[in-house]
Amino acid sequence: MDFTAKDVAKLREITGAGFADCKSALSDAKTFDEAIKLLEAKGQKRAEKVKSQDRATSEGLITSYIHHAGNLGVLLELNCSTDFVARSDEFKNLARELTLQIAGAHPAPIYANLSDIPAETLATMRAEFEADPEVKKRPEKVRAQVVEGKIKKRLSNEVLMEQVWIKDDKITIGKLVDEVIRKTGENIVIRRFARFELGA
């Protein structure tokens, strides 16, 4: 594909990718939309690679959100590997978005990550759904799938990383975090959070 410097700049603005990556994607793609898809795929792979590295995530910040009426508050610890990233606007904006998500999501999340859920809780949840009369009416072949679907649906409400972002229902919080991981090149971990609601 033939492209101009304006095309490279536009692609950088849309994807947040580096100059060389944008130039390479435009060279390899037949259309502008295809270049965007190439960069998104590359970014997702990079985020997965960064997550799999065994670097300590002991830097970061603790941030809060208090609703203007004073009846709702959130405290969040968000970690990364270096203080350089912890001071970056992308990281601070992510922390802000996460506190707003925790405050505004209904139902409110209980766990930060799937790995935070105790095995006993999952076993209890599975037993509850298996005992459901609606599930028992289903043919034997599909019951396990129905139970797994119900568990997945409940976890998409109870686990912050699985929730749909309140500002864009096309992406999950996990994808939002992955996007910042891709931009910063560092693993980011939601360590813990607490949500306080007056009278709850």
Where are these regions (language model features)?
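N-terminal assembly/interaction segments in proteins that build large macromolecular machines
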Residues: M1-A200
